[in-house]
Amino acid sequence: MRSGVIAQKVGMTRVFTEAGEHIPVTVLKLGNCQVLGHRTKEKNGYVALQVGSGSRKTVYMPKAERGQFAAAKVEPKRKVEEFRVSEDALLPVGAEIQADHFVVGQFVDVTGTSTGKGFAGGMKRWNFGGLRATHGVSVSHRSIGSTGGRQDPGKTFKNKKMPGHMGVDRVTTLNLRVVQTDVERGLILVEGAVPGTKGGWIRVRDAVKKALPADAPKPGKFRLANGDAAAEAPAAEQEGA
């Protein structure tokens, strides 16, 4: 199980195939996505990679966080996430994960924060039908109607679908196909829509319900902290780490 990456949503566009068909794609940009630390079975009880992306000023950063980035010898990151990985998929601390970590044609799962809609009624939020247009109904055409209670149980149960705040939820979209990658600009183009607004942070990782392509780099494609060309970490080196 390989690590994922943290990207920012740039927006949507389309690309054309050789047959002339157009494919709607979402552009995701990797903002210097680097490995910050390891979570090991012996110390933490599970195996994971801590990954950071983006840039952040240290003026208002807590001292503990500054020390964490200093220990990893990387610039402070705006967004930090953990990705569960297998023991043979641990990447070196400080390594920068490249866009060709994912290969064209493979499927990925993306997770983001949905667009906020503010306070919404039952018809918009839950697709309720509303009340009748005539036959005595006035003013309340878009209300939700009865919430289902009477003397027994004498209350409205929790989690009842009602008007309220809509959006700003953690949403995962499964099985989006990678259409193109651009290593120089750090871009990943995936087919279809991705949750969230432009500039939102997106977690991208290998699809859980699809097989990993045979040509996908293992344990990953990355650039070393000293500026060496992108490379794949040897499995033997990772086992001894």
UniProtKB/Swiss-Prot annotation:
<feature type="modified residue" description="N5-methylglutamine">
    <location>
        <position position="151"/>
    </location>
</feature>
<keyword id="KW-0694">RNA-binding</keyword>
<keyword id="KW-0689">Ribosomal protein</keyword>
<comment type="function">
    <text>One of the primary rRNA binding proteins, it binds directly near the 3'-end of the 23S rRNA, where it nucleates assembly of the 50S subunit.</text>
</comment>
<dbReference type="InterPro" id="IPR019927">
    <property type="entry name" value="Ribosomal_uL3_bac/org-type"/>
</dbReference>
<dbReference type="InterPro" id="IPR000597">
    <property type="entry name" value="Ribosomal_uL3"/>
</dbReference>
<dbReference type="GO" id="GO:0003735">
    <property type="term" value="F:structural constituent of ribosome"/>
</dbReference>
<protein>
    <recommendedName>
        <fullName>Large ribosomal subunit protein uL3</fullName>
    </recommendedName>
</protein>
<keyword id="KW-0687">Ribonucleoprotein</keyword>
<dbReference type="InterPro" id="IPR009000">
    <property type="entry name" value="Transl_B-barrel_sf"/>
</dbReference>
<dbReference type="Pfam" id="PF00297">
    <property type="entry name" value="Ribosomal_L3"/>
</dbReference>
<comment type="similarity">
    <text>Belongs to the universal ribosomal protein uL3 family.</text>
</comment>
<keyword id="KW-0699">rRNA-binding</keyword>
<comment type="subunit">
    <text>Part of the 50S ribosomal subunit. Forms a cluster with proteins L14 and L19.</text>
</comment>
<feature type="region of interest" description="Disordered">
    <location>
        <begin position="214"/>
        <end position="241"/>
    </location>
</feature>
<dbReference type="GO" id="GO:0006412">
    <property type="term" value="P:translation"/>
</dbReference>
<feature type="region of interest" description="Disordered">
    <location>
        <begin position="139"/>
        <end position="166"/>
    </location>
</feature>
<dbReference type="GO" id="GO:0022625">
    <property type="term" value="C:cytosolic large ribosomal subunit"/>
</dbReference>
<keyword id="KW-0488">Methylation</keyword>
<feature type="compositionally biased region" description="Low complexity">
    <location>
        <begin position="229"/>
        <end position="241"/>
    </location>
</feature>
<dbReference type="InterPro" id="IPR019926">
    <property type="entry name" value="Ribosomal_uL3_CS"/>
</dbReference>
<dbReference type="GO" id="GO:0019843">
    <property type="term" value="F:rRNA binding"/>
</dbReference>
